[in-house]
Amino acid sequence: MQSFLPFSRPAIGSEEINAVANVLGSGWITTGPQNHQLETDFCQIFGCKHAIAVCSATAGMHITLLALGIGPGDEVITPSQTWVSTINMIVLLGAEPVMVDVDRDTLMVNAAAIEAAITPNTKAIIPVHYAGAPCDLDALRQISQRHGIPLIEDAAHAVGTRYRDQWIGEQGTAIFSFHAIKNITCAEGGLVATDDDELAARVRRLKFHGLGVDAFDRQIQGRSPQAEVVEPGYKYNLSDIHAAIAVVQLRRLPEINARRQALVASYHKALAHLPLQPLALPHYSHQHAWHLFMVRVDEERCGISRDQLMACLKDMGIGSGLHFRAVHSQKYYRERYPHLCLPNTEWNSARLCTLPLFPDMLDSDIERVANALTTIIGSHRVTK
């Protein structure tokens, strides 16, 4: 019997294991030289001015919003078609999330929809680079500049993504994730990249108790006057155990993303005969990181609902995922915004299915998934 094929699995090898062992043997396992290495490498590779490692992208989003002064009475525009953590952070800061619709085929936010949602209370715009593709930053930056509203890019899916001739994170402010299923991982972790000196300084303070320096700096500098609380902050620093994994993964990113791209090309060929609807690619020049490979399962076309198809895949030993259930359709937000209607988001939320995609997949795994989908859809279309 074939083993279960998960929808994701981290590409952890001997280099990462040895890096962790070296940290454990070094005597310094919390925030230290590996964090510094990760931040330095990230800036060198992607051209960012500042890189601040944190314990998760959610933590990075929280303190970035806080650093921008977001609070009660403010509004933040963002899509509902995203992971719920962004909107949770807006609400927990006492601000109001203004959820907008996305393009039906790419899941990217529409610049016109964002501009239409701007009010005098709008204090930030958070677009999402979805599944590894970038949103249209030129249009969004023009809106940001025209209205004087900060743009914070949710780049959790976009490590190694390019928009036109720029890396995501090279310009502006972007927040990355190193969660277990991301293109590079350290189990849990994230990073804030920004070209804003003042914002970078405040994010760095807020991630570690509001101190002007982190633990590693304090050891080097002793009990210097600067090692004092400048403002109340959080404990969102990343340990060197985690950072060491991320340093190795970042070095391996080109091979990791190249393998993802090859697997997706195989998927497109293998699934071409099926009535599944993969996401469309943005029309502008870009480099896709292929964090996720998603299809839309429309019952009228496929003879089976998304949820039924996912259950059938599971019965056949194949994992799948849902990225994501629209935020405004979930209990807390559904009750808070009962009249919010986002047609494209809702259509996709009911049909999205993420198929297995990770660097260590075999070519035969793609064939296995395609054969399973062919069997499932074939049997249901016949019986309908």
From Swiss-Prot:
Gene3D superfamilies xrefs: Aspartate Aminotransferase, domain 1, Type I PLP-dependent aspartate aminotransferase-like (Major domain)
Gene Ontology annotations for the cellular component aspect, listed alphabetically: membrane
Keywords: Aminotransferase, Antibiotic resistance, Lipid A biosynthesis, Lipid biosynthesis, Lipid metabolism, Lipopolysaccharide biosynthesis, Pyridoxal phosphate, Transferase
CDD domains xrefs: AHBA_syn
SUPFAM superfamilies: PLP-dependent transferases (SSF53383)
EC number in record: 2.6.1.87
Essential cofactor(s): pyridoxal 5'-phosphate
NCBIfam families from the UniProt entry: PRK11658.1
Biological function: Catalyzes the conversion of UDP-4-keto-arabinose (UDP-Ara4O) to UDP-4-amino-4-deoxy-L-arabinose (UDP-L-Ara4N). The modified arabinose is attached to lipid A and is required for resistance to polymyxin and cationic antimicrobial peptides.
Subunit structure: Homodimer.
Family membership: Belongs to the DegT/DnrJ/EryC1 family. ArnB subfamily.
Name under which the protein is recorded: UDP-4-amino-4-deoxy-L-arabinose--oxoglutarate aminotransferase
Organism of this sequence: Yersinia pestis
Classification lineage: Bacteria, Pseudomonadati, Pseudomonadota, Gammaproteobacteria, Enterobacterales
